[in-house]
From Swiss-Prot:
The gene is gpmI. InterPro entries: Alkaline_phosphatase_core_sf, BPG-indep_PGM_N, Metalloenzyme, PGAM_B_sf, Pgm_bpd_ind. Keywords: Glycolysis, Isomerase, Manganese, Metal-binding. The keyword Metal-binding applies. This is 2,3-bisphosphoglycerate-independent phosphoglycerate mutase. Mn(2+) 2 binds at residues 15, 65, 439-440. Disulfide bonds: none annotated. Binds 2 manganese ions per subunit. Catalyzes the interconversion of 2-phosphoglycerate and 3-phosphoglycerate. Pathway: Carbohydrate degradation; glycolysis; pyruvate from D-glyceraldehyde 3-phosphate: step 3/5. Monomer. Substrate binds at residues 126, 156-157, 188, 194, 258-261, 331.
Amino acid sequence: MTKAPVAPVVLVILDGWGYCEETRGNAIAAAKTPVMESLWTAYPHTLIHTSGKAVGLPEGQMGNSEVGHLNIGAGRVVPQELVRISDAVEDGSILSNSALVKICQEVRNRNGKLHLVGLCSEGGVHSHITHLFGLLDLAKEQRISEVCIHAITDGRDTAPTDGINAISALEDYINHVGIGRIVTVSGRYYAMDRDRRWDRIQRAYDVMTQDGAGDGRKAVDVLQASYAEGVNDEFIVPVRIAPGTVESGDGVIFFNFRPDRSRQLTQAFVSPEFTGFARQQIKPLSFVTFTQYDSDLSVSVAFEPQNLTNILGEVIANQGLNQFRTAETEKYAHVTYFFNGGLEEPFAGEDRELVSSPMVATYDKAPAMSATAVTDTAIAAIQKGIYSLIVINYANPDMVGHTGQIEPTIQAIETVDRCLGRLLEGVSKAGGTTIITADHGNAEYMLDEAGNSWTAHTTNPVPLILVEGEKVKIPGYGTNVELRSDGKLADIAPTILDILQLPQPPEMTGRSLLQPAEYDVQSPRTRIPVGLN
């Protein structure tokens, strides 16, 4: 007998689509979004928290895509690496971290140099500069004679020219502790690419590994000269300013804690079968990453991954159900690796499809990105009729929002809105239920109070809309479901399990957003047109 098609729950994550009443600098408010506006009017909706303690970050700390997807997939508030490592610096336990102490001993025994590589930023998304200060304290305590800092500048999770403040603070701390020097400077556009643009990684790698005394400038002078040419922190061209080449016998500590933008540069240093560009592997070279960037990398890890059990993908798999994940390159790791709690391998019954992002320098040049192809991929998965859960990420609001260009971001928002309309038609035909939400804010706030471009994330809440399916009945909730107003990202997984009528495991401490109803759940619902055609 042929199995009846599955009516799926489709989770749509609009990356960087925050909520803000202020319309100035608000690309979402300025965009024409008839689908989202109709859905907001016609269907149950709420605002949920995506920053600070609600997602395991310090109070007031903006959320990000990694943290957002981790919390969504885990169904609980996950203490973040930023807090974990900051606590180690604060309480001094970083000084006795076994992986960090060991690399210092190896470098000292070989009479080599210790290289500290990472994003010099207070953004708290990929790193924090206070973690670098902790490493300088460690190097001093371990009596390392030569400490070379390879500074990567931000301008994406911070203001575009905030790097000069971070570098100045670093120089002050170097003077205070009496150890270390900045030897190279590189914008994150080059050193932290995650889209296999190996030419960018090579620019940073070559500067770090090729001999040379440098041009003798101070790091702040490099930044000021770049600003004068209209080049902000993100795009600082890699440059050597002082001696300190990474070479045989040395040790490297990569102090970024977020994996996705740290993998490629690490691969260039340690992978024996590396093919991104021609290079001679440096041996021996001790290498420590702050967190686990990839289980296949031959490195030591200072802060081992937390073990998350009974996360959403695992629960779906254990129930013998199928699931599907899709996103374009920029966000693919988020709907797979991060959504699965840092696991690389898919669960049983979990299918994935990567859609390539367009090969452009910055996404304001192609604001539609690959949203249409992502939509096509998702609709094809829905039409198979075999998936109980489908997870989709639209990267446009976040990736174009990060450029600081409002007009292209408006175009990006409008593209996603059109794609949503088409996607929802497909879900409706399958009798599925759609949850539309975001992982953090961005595109709703693109000008600061002084009118300057804002390229970072925000602490604003994000929308969540429940588009109820024709065939799906949600026992105990009635036909006009209400949603709680105090929710957070950790509540999404329990909500999905609620809709699928699956038990919530005790490890999943989030709470379903669905409000119990006092009326007959079988009473017919009058479908409200939402302008999807």
